């Protein structure tokens, strides 16, 4: 975490990581495997070694499906009661402790209360506080702000994850972005034109990226960070892409995109 993360938490996560992977396998997550049957590894953004377990290009989705399947089994045996189509409205605080929530039934519109000995908020991020986001539309900060108003403390609210690989935005009215797998940076090379006039032609649709010769392409991540290349951490890749676009070297009709070239991976 570039020395920004809490070292004790990172150390603990590393300690239990093997057990977490084993649990995911037991839940049915179809991780990629080598020919001999052992789990395969690959390198992801921010890592120079192959230490990431993956499920082709759908790792996150398969992890969710595995968790949902395990939850469904507990619902089926009666150890968990699941309420769908509800949205948390507020946290109930008694003597300084969270003792329940107020939730809205999105079907009937009625408010309902749920008491508990402990409350776990597992609502994901709040990316839709920003105009452009790849998050689901429900990640809208309502749960986080409800907790904040009742006295919860944000560890680092500015540290919202910025993802460098998504399908570029088209036009001024689009706010929902489509996420692309992080593994794509492992196989591709990110570049923009070296000449600003080429970028302008690309934005106007006068030429295509394939028309630009190799010597006129700026593989800026490989140039700036030779040790990591295209596998720099997400925030570094995102900031670098924004800097190139702000400087006028962006592509697409909006000028707010960069190229991710897979020609070498395809030839392999």
Language model regions located:
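Glycine-rich active-site loop/strand segments that organize a redox cofactor
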Residues: 1-13
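General structural feature for long, well-ordered alpha-helical segments within catalytic domains
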Residues: 9, 16-20, 48, 59, ...
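Hydrophobic or amphipathic alpha-helical targeting/insertion segments
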Residues: 16-31, 143-157
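Conserved redox-cofactor binding core of oxidoreductases
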Residues: 25-110, 122, 166-179
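Short hydrophobic core segments
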Residues: 113-124, 147
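A conserved FAD-binding loop/helix module that cradles the flavin
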Residues: 129-150
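An anion/pyrophosphate-binding glycine-rich loop and adjacent beta-alpha core
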Residues: 146, 152-268
């Amino acid at each position: 975490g570039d020395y920004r993360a809490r070292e004790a938490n990172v150390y603990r996560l590393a300690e239990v990581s093997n057990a977490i992977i084993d649990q995911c396998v037991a839940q049915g997550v179809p991780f990629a495997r080598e020919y001999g049957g052992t789990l395969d590894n690959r390198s992801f953004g921010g890592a120079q070694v192959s230490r990431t377990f993956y499920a082709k290009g759908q790792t996150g989705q398969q992890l969710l499906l595995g968790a949902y399947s395990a939850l469904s089994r507990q619902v089926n045996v009666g150890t968990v009661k699941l309420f769908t189509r509800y949205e948390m409205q507020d946290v109930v605080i008694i003597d300084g402790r969270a003792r329940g929530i107020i939730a809205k039934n999105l079907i009937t519109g009625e408010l309902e209360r749920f008491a508990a000995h402990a409350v776990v908020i597992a609502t994901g991020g709040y990316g839709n506080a920003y105009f452009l986001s790849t998050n689901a539309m429900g990640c809208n900060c309502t749960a986080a702000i409800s907790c904040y108003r009742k006295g919860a403390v944000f560890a680092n609210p500015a540290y919202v994850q910025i993802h460098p690989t998504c399908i570029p935005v088209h036009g001024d009215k689009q706010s929902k972005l489509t996420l692309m797998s992080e593994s794509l940076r492992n196989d591709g090379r990110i570049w923009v034109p070296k000449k600003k006039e080429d970028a302008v032609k690309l934005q106007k649709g006068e030429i295509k990226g394939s028309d630009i010769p190799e010597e006129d392409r700026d593989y800026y991540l490989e140039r700036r960070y030779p040790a990591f290349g295209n596998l720099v951490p997400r925030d570094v890749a995102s900031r670098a892409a924004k800097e190139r676009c702000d400087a006028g070297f962006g592509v697409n009709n909006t000028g707010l995109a960069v190229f991710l070239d897979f020609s070498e991976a395809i030839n392999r």
